[in-house]
C-alpha cells in the first residue's frame, strides 16, 4: 500500500484512474474510502488521489500534531510523493478546512479548490453541536453516536426516501474502532479551525458548495467562506451535509464543470 512519511507519521493514500489529478479529502472520520461513489466517478476522467488522514484508516494511528495545518502539510507531502501536482483539491467538511489551508500555505500545489460543507471558523452553534457529539461518544459509545449523528448529517428528505442507505451508513460507522484519544483530538481540531483572517489571501480558483439542508455546517458557513475568498463561486444544492453520498451525480457534475474551467 502506498504511503509517505510526513513529520515522522506514515500517511496512506490510494491512486486510481488517469487524467488531470484530483485530491479527495475526507471529513472528520478521515478515511478516504468514505467518499464512496465519488472515487469511481472522478476516476472515470481523472487521476484520483485518496488519502487517509493521520490517525485514521491505514495511516499511522496517532493523536500527535492533530491540527488542520499539519493535515495540510501531510497532504502536500502526498501530492509530492505521487508527483502529480498541481492538483484539483476537493475537500468535504474537515477536508474542506484542510483544502483552505492548502490554498493558503501550499498554493503552488493547487490548480483549483472545491470546499464542500465546511466552515471558516466555529461559532457557538458549531461548538455546542460538537460538545454534544463528544459527550455522546464518551457516554454512549460509537453506535449510539452514529445513530444520533445521522440526524445532523443526512437531509431529512433523503432519510425519508432512503432509510436503508442511512442505516447502512450507521452500521458501517458503528463497525469501526473508536480510539478516544484520536477521536477527541480530531473533534478538537475541527472546532479549533480558524482560517477566517487568512481567506482573503487565497488566489486559487475556488468553488464553495453546500447542501441547502446541511444541519451540521449550515449554509451560512459556506456563504461566509465564499464571501471571504476572492472570486469564489458559491453553489447551494439540494441535500444535507453528506451530499456527496445523497446526490453523487449532481455533486460530481457540479464539481467537474468547475474543474473543466480551471484545467490550465
Regions found by a protein language model. Give the residues of each.
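Catalytic histidine-centered segment of alpha/beta-hydrolase-like enzymes
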Residues: 240-252
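Catalytic histidine neighborhood in serine/cysteine hydrolases
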Residues: 223-242
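Active-site loop/oxyanion-hole signature of alpha/beta-hydrolase fold enzymes
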Residues: 49-90
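Conserved HGGG/HGGXW glycine-rich cap/lid loop of the alpha/beta-hydrolase fold
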Residues: 7-61
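Short beta-strand/loop motif that positions the catalytic acidic residue
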Residues: 202, 208-210
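Flexible "cap/lid" loop of the alpha/beta hydrolase fold
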Residues: 100, 104, 111-140
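Conserved alpha/beta-hydrolase catalytic His-Asp/Glu region
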Residues: 124-126, 144-198
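Acidic catalytic loop of the alpha/beta-hydrolase fold
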Residues: 213-217
Amino acid at each position: 500500500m502506498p504511503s509517505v512519511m510526513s513529520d515522522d507519521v506514515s500517511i496512506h493514500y490510494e491512486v486510481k484512474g488517469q487524467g488531470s489529478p484530483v485530491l479527495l479529502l475526507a471529513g472528520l472520520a478521515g478515511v478516504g474510502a468514505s467518499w464512496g461513489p465519488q472515487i469511481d466517478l472522478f476516476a472515470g476522467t481523472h487521476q484520483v488521489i485518496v488519502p487517509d488522514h493521520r490517525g485514521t484508516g491505514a495511516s499511522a494511528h496517532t493523536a500527535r500534531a492533530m491540527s488542520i495545518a499539519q493535515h495540510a502539510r501531510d497532504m502536500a507531502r502526498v501530492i509530492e510523493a505521487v508527483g502529480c501536482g498541481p492538483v484539483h483539491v476537493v475537500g468535504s467538511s474537515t477536508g474542506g478546512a484542510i483544502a483552505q489551508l492548502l490554498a493558503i500555505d501550499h498554493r503552488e500545489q493547487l490548480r483549483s479548490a472545491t470546499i464542500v460543507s465546511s466552515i471558516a471558523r466555529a461559532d457557538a452553534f458549531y461548538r455546542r453541536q460538537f460538545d454534544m457529539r463528544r459527550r455522546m461518544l464518551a457516554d454512549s459509545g460509537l453506535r449510539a453516536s452514529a445513530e444520533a449523528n445521522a440526524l445532523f448529517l443526512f437531509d431529512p428528505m433523503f432519510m425519508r426516501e432512503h432509510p436503508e442507505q442511512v442505516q447502512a451508513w450507521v452500521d458501517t460507522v458503528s463497525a469501526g474502532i473508536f480510539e478516544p484519544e484520536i477521536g477527541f483530538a480530531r473533534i478538537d481540531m475541527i472546532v479549533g479551525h480558524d482560517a477566517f483572517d487568512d481567506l482573503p489571501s487565497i488566489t486559487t480558483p475556488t468553488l464553495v458548495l453546500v447542501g441547502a439542508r446541511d444541519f451540521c455546517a449550515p449554509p451560512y458557513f459556506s456563504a461566509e467562506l465564499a464571501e471571504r475568498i476572492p472570486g469564489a463561486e458559491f453553489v447551494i444544492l439540494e441535500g444535507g451535509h453528506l451530499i456527496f453520498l445523497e446526490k453523487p451525480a449532481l455533486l460530481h457534475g457540479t464539481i467537474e464543470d468547475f474543474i473543466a474551467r480551471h484545467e490550465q
